[in-house]
Amino acid sequence: TSVGRDASADIQIDDNGLSRKHFEIVWDGKNAAVRDLRSTNGTTVNGKKIDEVAIADNTLIQAGRSDFTFRVIARTISE
């Protein structure tokens, strides 16, 4: 899932500090990672600048002038 200020981003945020496609979150069904997409201003996770890093529930992602909290919400699949 890509995040940025461009309409082509999966999640579009009106923040001039964000690149058109700033970062993406990758989820494999068990584990998640955040990857900076060569943004101009960089992406930080829990206060550390990253290129790519594994993330867990309640991880703070900062990009541009925006803060994001990654949440994992379990859901029950009924049969």
Which positions does each model-derived feature cover?
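Forkhead-associated
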Residues: 1-67
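Regulatory inter-domain linker segments that are low-complexity and enriched
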Residues: 65-79
